[in-house]
């Protein structure tokens, strides 16, 4: 066991991401991020997302309260919807805490009225 005297905020250790394109129109895209937290006392505290050009940058932050905790990895899975509405057709990159994957939008993702 380790004892922490201050809260700890850090990035989640993401091991893999999976991109899921839902069969709908407009298309919906989700990223499933999987990894391990350093202990069961650490939790996902915040998921931030921004897009620069054709790249989605997603940051998963963790929070750990001060105190004792057993030192054993705690797996996590976080499902993150991407804001892909109104995007033109093309290839896009997703980066979640440094782990990257790509997906293709076959057509412009705009609902015509």
Where are the predicted features?
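Exposed, flexible binding/inhibitory loops of compact, secreted disulfide-stabilized domains
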Residues: 1-113
């Amino acid at each position: 066991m380790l004892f922490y005297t201050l809260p700890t905020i850090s990035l989640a250790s993401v091991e893999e991401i999976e991109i899921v394109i839902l069969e709908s129109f407009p298309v919906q895209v989700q990223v499933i991020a999987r990894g391990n937290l350093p202990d069961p006392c650490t939790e996902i505290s915040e998921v931030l997302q921004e897009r620069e050009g054709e790249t989605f940058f997603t940051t998963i932050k963790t929070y750990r309260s001060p105190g004792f905790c057993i030192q054993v990895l705690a797996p996590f899975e976080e499902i993150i919807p991407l804001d892909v509405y109104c995007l033109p057709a093309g290839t896009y990159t997703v980066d979640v805490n440094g782990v990257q994957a790509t997906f293709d939008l076959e057509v412009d993702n705009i609902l015509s009225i």
